[in-house]
Amino acid sequence: MTSTTLTPAVPAPDPAGAPADGSAQPPAVVFVHGMRTSGAIWERQVEHVRALGHDAVAVDLPAHGARAHERFTLDRSFEVLDEAAASFGPGRRVALVGLSLGGYTSLAWAARRPANLAGVVAAACTSDPKGKPVALYRDVARLVVVGGGAVGRGARWAARTSGAAWSAITRAGRSLPGGGASSHALAGPGDAGAAHRPAAPGWHVVTDALTQLAGRSWLAHVRDVDVPVWLVNGARDHMRLDEQRYLAAAADAALVVVPRAGHDVNSEAPEAFNRVLGRALADFGRGRGARLGA
């Protein structure tokens, strides 16, 4: 297990060589987005890995993007990943790259030890989403869903309660578990100002996702993963809270912290993230059982 802080001087090794398992092709890459975004957030990364010689696809999770009509569940999310992996053809090795909700989903899917999985890059997801702050946030989100956007005195109460939930989460040292930026999630579905969030899903996906996440231990999932795991965090992300525990739990892992980046590390520091991605894909090409960094 290794831990490092990324600096601009660190070059990315060329990952385009033949994988150690003898496959004629480098692993394909499946990108998995965070809460209330879509596969569109990965545009720069998809372009980057394709230039390195990897096939790639960025999926939309249930309740997001092209699957906005579906309810979010982990079981349905696993089906989406199954379909994406199978789309590259039988026997093709696949690497997962997930951010936040997508990172948690990727780790849980990888813990099932699917055939032909080469490795996982799990970004912004090293804090188990559990406890009273998360439950409070989920309950506030559910209230907004049931109320359909309360008005008058109810709206003011909801706003105050939302603020209390946010304060509790930040006091606990956490960003919104599973989501993109906590700030835009608290603002509701009408705040999609970022270019990569043209149509953010509504509050129902927050309640559904947090309900799904809160009942699991992602540390346990990390322990069950039998391929290399690269943990990538922005230095300013509160979700770094348990990164050392996640690093210690994994049988084969690396931790990279990107300076000056926050939760949405792939879009806040795309060049740095792409360098990390290149290094991770090169690592995934080595034979299982080799020492990390050897």
Question: Which role does the model predict for each range below?
Answer:
Residues 175-220:
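Hydrophobic, aromatic-rich cap/lid helix
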Residues 21-66:
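Conserved HGGG/HGGXW glycine-rich cap/lid loop of the alpha/beta-hydrolase fold
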Residues 111-112, 117-152:
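Flexible "cap/lid" loop of the alpha/beta hydrolase fold
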Residues 14, 55-97, 275:
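Active-site loop/oxyanion-hole signature of alpha/beta-hydrolase fold enzymes
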Residues 228-261:
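Conserved loop-alpha-helix segment in the C-terminal half of the alpha/beta-hydrolase fold
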Residues 98-102, 106:
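Gly/Ala-rich beta-loop-alpha elbow adjacent to hydrolase catalytic centers
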Residues 32-34, 99, 233-234:
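The conserved beta1-alpha1 loop
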Residues 261-274:
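Catalytic histidine-centered segment of alpha/beta-hydrolase-like enzymes
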